[in-house]
Amino acid sequence: MRLWHQILIPLLPRAQLLGQHRECAALRGAGWGRPHATVNYVFTHSPYKLYLYHALIMEEMEKRGYKPDVLWKDPLYRGKAVAPYHAHAAETATSPIHAEHDDAYLDECLENLKSKGIML
């Protein structure tokens, strides 16, 4: 799984949006720091950046009538199986949240979606 370019979040079909929530939850929990070719870049940033991205996903889910567990809205929460962070510095959201989400990454994401039969 990959983290879709954040500009695509409002356009993602249901399955991809909900998949992003699962991916973010896994990465914020026990998956933090575990190598995975398509998401390794998130580990070079503060976990707070991933929280900010996940917050965008949850906001879009709520716009569509889904109700993600409110526990995930806590930036220190890491899931039921992992102890929460004690603290980490809050950061101002940048656009894009992850600098890696540039125009080339957007094109890569669009091609990936196209290969799945999803035209945005």
Regions found by a protein language model. Give the residues of each.
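Expand to "…catalyze enediolate/carbanion chemistry for C-C bond making/breaking, isomerization
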Residues: 1-120
